Swiss-Prot record:
The lineage of its organism: Eukaryota, Viridiplantae, Streptophyta, Embryophyta, Tracheophyta. Keywords: Chloroplast, Plastid, Ribonucleoprotein, Ribosomal protein, RNA-binding, rRNA-binding. This is Small ribosomal subunit protein uS8c. PANTHER family: 40S RIBOSOMAL PROTEIN S15A. It is found in: Plastid, Chloroplast. GO terms for biological process: translation. GO terms for cellular component: chloroplast; ribonucleoprotein complex; ribosome.
Length: 134
């Protein structure tokens, strides 16, 4: 069985966010780098750096948390994997779902690379729906 790297990074970020960890280390692949760049651009994570250890590359993510808060606070409310290895979900650009009326983002894998739902609608292309973030 193969590994689902997208599900692994989503789970790692979600678990670190619930545990209020500041730093997460995930394996670096082309897909994970593209998804993390989208999360960085959209403001869900604070910083990314590439780290090499024993000829393997890792991405070290710094999550964005509010400091000095008495009550529990989570920045990333929810991440959900949609298309998975056993059930691929595709959509054309007109039927890409809007998450929370446009407040959340949908990450798609298109013929022009991995992009958000807004970018795909602007370019008029659809693709495989990888995950929802809201």
């Amino acid at each position: 069985m193969g590994r689902d790297t997208i599900a692994e990074i989503i789970t790692s970020i979600r678990n670190a966010d619930m545990d209020r960890k500041r730093v997460v280390r995930i394996a670096s692949t082309n897909i994970t780098e593209n998804i993390i760049q989208i999360l960085l651009r959209e403001g869900f994570i604070e910083n990314v750096r590439k780290h090499r250890e024993n000829n393997k590359y890792f991405l070290v993510l710094t999550l964005r948390h509010r400091r000095n808060r008495k009550r529990p606070y989570r920045n990333i409310l929810n991440l959900k994997r949609i298309s998975r290895p056993g059930l691929r979900i595709y959509s054309n650009y007109q039927r890409i779902p809007r998450i929370l009326g446009g407040m959340g983002i949908v990450i798609l894998s298109t013929s022009r690379g991995i992009m958000t739902d807004r970018e795909a609608r602007l370019e008029g292309i659809g693709g495989e729906i990888l995950c929802y973030i809201w």
